[in-house]
Amino acid sequence: MADSVRVGLIQLTAEDTPAANVRKTLPRIEEAAAKGAKIIGLQEMFTTKYFCITQDPKNFDLAEPIETGPSVTELAKAAKRLGVVIVAPLFEARGSEVYHNTAAVIDADGTVLGK
């Protein structure tokens, strides 16, 4: 077992759409992995601009399911390809009218370990 683990933390300015934020984040994940990070943490609500100060229903469209959502799906591919664990906080749609500020934990084999 290794005596230490390198952790990479990524903080970026947010774009207007979740897809744009994922596209912006993926190269930084690759960069962190290339520098030896085995665990990579993203900023809170990485797929959106931070809006949690208010409860505005117009933001509910930005939520996505953890297990099947497009953002986690793309990150899972990257985690598997790079052999890294990714902690990805995002706005989760967890059912009808149930939303959470959640972090998905994606293992180095691309599986979602939990949230």
What is each residue range found by the language model?
Residues 18-19, 27-112:
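Cys-nucleophile CN-hydrolase/nitrilase-fold catalytic domain and related Cys-dependent amidase chemistry
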Residues 4-16, 102, 114-115:
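Active-site-proximal beta-strand elements of phosphoester/diester hydrolases
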